[in-house]
């Protein structure tokens, strides 16, 4: 009787996991590279792949995507560090280029001059490709912008009193990452995520992240493919729901039998087994866990209002 349903379930699982496996493999092969090193134009090594990977581990040790995120994964608290770094660094880069060319900051330029400076910066960011030896060369201006942005993040994850209010807004405690070297390498990891989000993927007209994040300073806009697949996926979802509803409503051969109410309460006939009776002793344990879960949920939600406290209780000093 249920054979055809089992066949349908197995077919859906096979097709679904086959697509998932193919796309997962494709994503793995197209993952952005981690350069062996970032170097200056005179060949000086700024930092290496090992520094980036150590910075990733250092960032993950603070909770990873729970407090701030990278590459747009999203978190309850704090901004996306990739998008935040990109905006800050490009802003500094535009000022540096503007001062070199015109002697004033970017926001003091006219429209035509701003467009010219922006185009120069865009070309440098998009063209920051990996060389055959696995390294990426950064210009002196890019290095200066990177270092200026990196100092902010090193101090943000430290205990700089000037950023105390910012940490409170982001639900970060002072000295989120106590070791200075860990903070420096973490900043390098953030830079790498920003590099992949602003560098053109070879053979395409978009960055490694399909022009994410939206950054007007670099004219980052969604690619036509991203828009098309977003629309197609919504259409497929709606059509699929419609087919399921139609089959359920009109595909059944027979109407369901009318339900007949029982003559007596069926629960009254149930006899508890010894194992069911033994569950009573765990009632208070379950209640305690439920209350603990409610409390933790309240604390986490309240971090949006008080980033380092809970109704005046300074939790950041203890946890």
Specify the residue positions occupied by each region the protein language model found.
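Post-cleavage N-terminal segment of exported redox proteins
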Residues: 1-47
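Alpha-helical transmembrane segments and their helix-start/interface "positive-inside/aromatic belt" motifs
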Residues: 2-15, 226-234, 271-291
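Structural signature of transmembrane alpha-helix termini at the membrane-water interface
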Residues: 18-29, 245, 295-303
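Alpha-helical transmembrane segments
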Residues: 20, 228-253, 318
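Soluble extramembrane regions of membrane proteins in the secretory/endomembrane system
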Residues: 29-227
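Amphipathic alpha-helical packing elements
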Residues: 76-77, 83, 311-319
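Gly/Pro-rich turn-and-neighbor structural signature
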Residues: 250-316
């Amino acid at each position: 009787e249920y054979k055809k349903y089992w066949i349908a379930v197995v077919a859906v699982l096979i097709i679904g996991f086959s697509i998932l496996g193919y796309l997962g493999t494709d994503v793995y092969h197209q993952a952005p590279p981690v350069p062996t090193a970032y170097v200056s134009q005179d060949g000086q090594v700024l930092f290496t792949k090992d520094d980036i990977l150590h910075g990733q581990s250092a960032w993950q040790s603070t909770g990873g995507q729970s407090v701030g995120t990278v590459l747009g994964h999203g978190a309850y608290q704090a901004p996306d560090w990739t998008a935040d770094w990109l905006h800050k660094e490009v802003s500094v880069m535009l000022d540096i280029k503007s001062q070199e060319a015109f002697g004033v900051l970017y926001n003091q330029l006219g429209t035509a001059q701003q467009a010219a400076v922006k185009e120069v910066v865009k070309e440098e960011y998009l063209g920051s490709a990996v060389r055959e030896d696995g390294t990426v060369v950064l210009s002196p201006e890019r290095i200066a912008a990177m270092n200026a942005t990196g100092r902010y993040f090193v101090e943000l994850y430290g205990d700089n009193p000037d950023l105390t209010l910012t940490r409170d807004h982001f639900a970060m405690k002072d000295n989120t990452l106590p070791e200075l070297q860990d903070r420096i390498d973490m900043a390098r990891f953030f830079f790498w995520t920003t590099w992949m989000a602003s560098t053109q993927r070879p053979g395409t007209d978009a960055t490694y992240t399909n022009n994410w994040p939206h950054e007007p300073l670099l004219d980052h806009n969604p690619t036509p493919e991203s828009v098309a697949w977003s629309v197609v996926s919504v259409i497929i979802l709606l059509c699929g729901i419609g087919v399921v509803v139609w089959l359920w409503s009109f595909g059944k051969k027979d109407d369901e039998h009318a339900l007949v109410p029982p003559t007596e309460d069926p629960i009254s006939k149930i006899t508890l087994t010894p194992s069911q009776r033994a569950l009573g002793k765990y009632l208070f344990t379950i209640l305690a866990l439920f209350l603990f879960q409610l409390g933790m949920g309240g604390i986490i939600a309240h971090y949006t209002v008080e980033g380092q406290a809970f109704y005046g209780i300074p939790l950041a000093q203890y946890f």
